[in-house]
A protein has these predicted regions:
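Ser/Thr/Pro/Gly-rich low-complexity disordered regions
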Residues: 3, 10-29, 34-133
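Trp/Gly-enriched beta-strand/coil motifs that build multi-repeat beta-propeller-like domains
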Residues: 131-381
Length: 381
């Protein structure tokens, strides 16, 4: 499936194909009246990542079955790559698991007897990718910001329903790493992980345990100190596994595809001239086309959106902000305000933590201050 032909997904409508309803006429009896011959297609919400929940909704009165005055009369089932997902209940919600990674999911609505021939199915989703960074670290699909203190303590700040939960310490000694980042689930166990690069260039994987802690570490690379920036965009080439982008001193940007088991596939060049940008962040799908994107700030303070094409490359660039050079830290860790769109956080010179709310179309839907005293952290991710 090409990037251009993949259905729009996330917090938007999944187009549906309509199967015509067929009602047999009983002998010596009038044909029962169909309430709706062409019901509206169902709508699927949710992100196509392991750990996310897909929800199907529809107008129940468009599926009234047969007979005068018949009420809502439907049942639901889900398919995985066209086969009935018998391991999932026939409910409107579908929690995506590791068994769904790389597969496509569809929801089916069937009118119960006597209209058993009436069935409407949504189009299949894009292939499900590994759990991504915005899903958090405690298996709740919550916004959970990691902050490293100068003493090396790693703190987690969960935020649910626009309210911060109490911070908790999830690690010590993390000041040995000049660079830390979260690629999402990098080893294929369904839990989100963290990568740390030490001063000698060793790259270490800390596997998440799904409860806000870590198992490991284990070394997954050497020589990574040749890079001036490391970020994880998520699944940048749409193969179902999470990846890393690395920029060298010459400004060459490399894509290191993850193999889904804590290792790597062969790298490729993803861009040139990226040393003109002093900050690179990875907000996920920022423009609503199902492909993950990259935001980058230049020395003049312009914030640029580089749209991913879903195949390890780009689909154009646009400027989405000015004046961002007044912010000491910029990053993205998911959906801060719970509206279904990915956002950007930033710390200003006074230590205020600001949220810049994405509109799901490559732009903004306002901003707000969501915290104070954040200037003392050496890293936020």
């Amino acid at each position: 499936m090409s990037a251009s032909s993949r259905p729009a997904f996330g917090v938007r409508r999944a187009l549906a194909g309509i199967a015509a309803a067929v009602v047999a006429m009983a002998t010596f009896a009038p044909a029962p009246a169909m309430a709706t011959m062409d019901p509206e297609p169902p709508v699927i919400t949710g992100a196509p990542y392991v750990g996310s929940t897909l929800t199907v909704s529809w107008d129940p009165y468009a599926y009234k079955g047969c007979g005068a005055g018949a009420g809502p009369d439907t049942r639901i089932y889900w398919t995985r790559d066209g086969e009935v997902a018998t391991d999932h209940p026939t409910w409107p919600n579908y929690v995506l698991g590791e068994e769904d990674r790389g597969k496509t999911i569809a929801a089916h609505l069937v009118a119960n007897y006597p209209c058993e021939n009436m069935e409407v199915a949504s189009e299949e989703t894009a292939p499900i990718s590994a759990s991504h960074r915005p899903s958090g670290f405690t298996s709740r699909s919550a916004f959970e910001l990691l902050a490293r203190r100068s003493d090396g303590a790693l703190m987690m700040y969960p935020r649910i329903n626009n309210t911060w939960e109490p911070a908790r310490t999830v690690g010590v000694g993390w000041n040995i790493f000049p660079t830390v980042l979260s690629p999402g689930d990098f080893d294929g166990d369904g839990n989100n992980d963290v990568l740390g690069r030490d001063s000698a260039g060793g790259l270490y994987l800390y596997s998440g345990d799904g409860a806000g802690g870590w198992t490991g570490p284990r070394k997954v690379g050497t020589g990574w100190n040749i890079f001036t920036a490391l970020v994880s965009p998520g699944d940048f080439n749409s193969d179902g596994t999470n990846d890393v982008l690395a920029r060298d001193a010459n400004g060459v940007l490399y894509l290191y595809p993850g193999d889904g088991h804590g290792g790597w596939l062969p790298r490729s060049v993803a861009g040139q001239g990226w040393n003109a940008l002093n900050t690179i962040i990875t907000p996920g799908d920022f423009d609503g086309d199902t492909n993950v994107d990259v935001l980058a700030r230049d020395s003049a303070g312009s914030l640029k959106l580089y749209r991913g094409n879903g195949a390890g490359g780009w689909n154009g660039m646009s400027v989405v902000g000015q004046g961002w050079n007044g912010l000491s830290k910029i990053g993205s860790a998911g959906d801060i305000n719970g509206d279904g769109n990915f956002d950007v956080f930033a710390v200003d010179g006074s230590g205020q933590l600001k949220a810049y709310y994405g509109n799901g179309k490559g732009g903004w839907n306002g901003s707000g201050v969501v915290g104070w005293g954040w200037g003392g952290f050496t890293d936020l991710f």
